[in-house]
């Protein structure tokens, strides 16, 4: 999860987030090299007295500044498209969970079970226990098995919301009348925090998401108690 004065993204917990971190570093290096080149050219222009005031045509220069940006865009687009298709791919999910956005809370339904659903509200600051996080704790966590492919169906009952968990690389819009889907897989157990990432009204900041990733045996015990 995030911590105060953090530089960079949250630690990756899913394969998709690991790919996104690699792509971020790849793109950042390209941007750094372009910025360095531009600053170098600007410094040369400011420090040298050599000018070409009579130059009317420079085919070589025009060729270079047309081909070079095209190559740079290809180097960014190819890995980006690869990750995009990976995020859209859904292969035999082990569990399906439907989440609905409301003003201003989330509701969850485990569709593989007959009667396993609940609402998830933020815990007010005055009710927090020692060690709990302000504006991030909920009364009902989403318990899911780790190391398994989970399909999330996301929609909304009222206005636009967005279901996002940064450490898993997830951000899916919740749109009224439309059912979006995404997949997640956590490689290690733990608590993973997220929030609504679409401005949805006065209490937009009070719609936290808490995923509790646990071993399969623990999840089976929990689901048996909840049904």
Swiss-Prot record:
It is an enzyme of class 7 (translocase). One of its GO terms (molecular function) is copper ion binding. Residues 46-59 are mitochondrial matrix. The keyword DNA-binding does not apply. Residues 1-14, 88-227 are mitochondrial intermembrane. It catalyses: 4 Fe(II)-[cytochrome c] + O2 + 8 H(+)(in) = 4 Fe(III)-[cytochrome c] + 2 H2O + 4 H(+)(out). Its cofactor is Cu cation. Binds a dinuclear copper A center per subunit. Cu cation A1 binds at residues 161, 196, 200, 207. Mg(2+) binds at residue 198. Cu cation A2 binds at residues 196, 198, 200, 204. Its EC number is 7.1.1.9. The chain crosses the membrane at residues 15-45, 60-87. The modification Phosphotyrosine is found at residue 218. GO terms for biological process: ATP synthesis coupled electron transport. GO terms for cellular component: mitochondrial inner membrane; respiratory chain complex IV. It is found in: Mitochondrion inner membrane. Pfam families: COX2 (PF00116), COX2_TM (PF02790). Component of the cytochrome c oxidase (complex IV, CIV), a multisubunit enzyme composed of 14 subunits. The complex is composed of a catalytic core of 3 subunits MT-CO1, MT-CO2 and MT-CO3, encoded in the mitochondrial DNA, and 11 supernumerary subunits COX4I, COX5A, COX5B, COX6A, COX6B, COX6C, COX7A, COX7B, COX7C, COX8 and NDUFA4, which are encoded in the nuclear genome. Belongs to the cytochrome c oxidase subunit 2 family. Component of the cytochrome c oxidase, the last enzyme in the mitochondrial electron transport chain which drives oxidative phosphorylation. The respiratory chain contains 3 multisubunit complexes succinate dehydrogenase (complex II, CII), ubiquinol-cytochrome c oxidoreductase (cytochrome b-c1 complex, complex III, CIII) and cytochrome c oxidase (complex IV, CIV), that cooperate to transfer electrons derived from NADH and succinate to molecular oxygen, creating an electrochemical gradient over the inner membrane that drives transmembrane transport and the ATP synthase. PANTHER family: CYTOCHROME C OXIDASE SUBUNIT 2, CYTOCHROME C OXIDASE, SUBUNIT II. This is Cytochrome c oxidase subunit 2. The lineage of its organism: Eukaryota, Metazoa, Chordata, Craniata, Vertebrata.
